[in-house]
């Protein structure tokens, strides 16, 4: 497993946790951490489908922040696991608003990495009056070019990993690799969807870090959530118009933001972070020279904690 960066705050347990039924199908897990009178912050995990980790609570000073975290529909402890029906970006945004209302929060800092950065931007552009600012990492704008890179661009860096991912798919289906995996992942036969889920999760997980890490134990929860929901969202363009997040950036451009990006991120390459900052001159782009995609890589974790420390002191990122 990756070494825990020294810059993180000590492990902490939730002060409250529970389940919230958001429709007739989905129930989402939530937790609250830190000071109930602190600065409200919303943590958005990646994937989609990756779910929460106890480490996610540790980017924030628990004496200064009131941290709200939740497993998005179909992820982690939310039920049903891997459920893609009634699961869209707009519905996730609605869930965030349900949580904000439930907790009685007027405005909050929004913190998200990878797919979490996508959802953070989409939420902010839908509800700018509810946001204090943004801490974003590993930017994914969910454009068609980024989706194509995720599936095919990696072969320039990890050709053996790409070949392993493609190998189970018959030759006549390889012209639409995303469609081929989605058909397998979203079917009802566990003998079909489990191997596909594990292959998808390996394909992504083995390129998260710049430097190789010891293999972690496989998690069925992670594999099924990530495989099903990433393929579902990518097949639908993230339920966004192409480049919508850049187009609508004016709605949040007045708010403070910091972007922490690994220079050698081969899942969400730096071009997207660069494009976002160019369109958002007030945002601070902090390129980490010796990191890939992982939030727990030392330089990225340090950058994220630095950002939350700056915001608690000044309400901005300088």
What are these regions (language model features)?
Residues 48-61:
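The serine-hydrolase catalytic nucleophile loop
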Residues 61-80:
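Conserved alpha/beta-hydrolase
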Residues 131-181:
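A catalytic-pocket lid/entrance helix-loop region that shapes and gates access to the active site
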Residues 266-272:
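Conserved alpha/beta-hydrolase "acid-adjacent" motif
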Residues 283-318:
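Catalytic active-site module of serine/aspartate enzymes centered on a nucleophile-bearing elbow/loop
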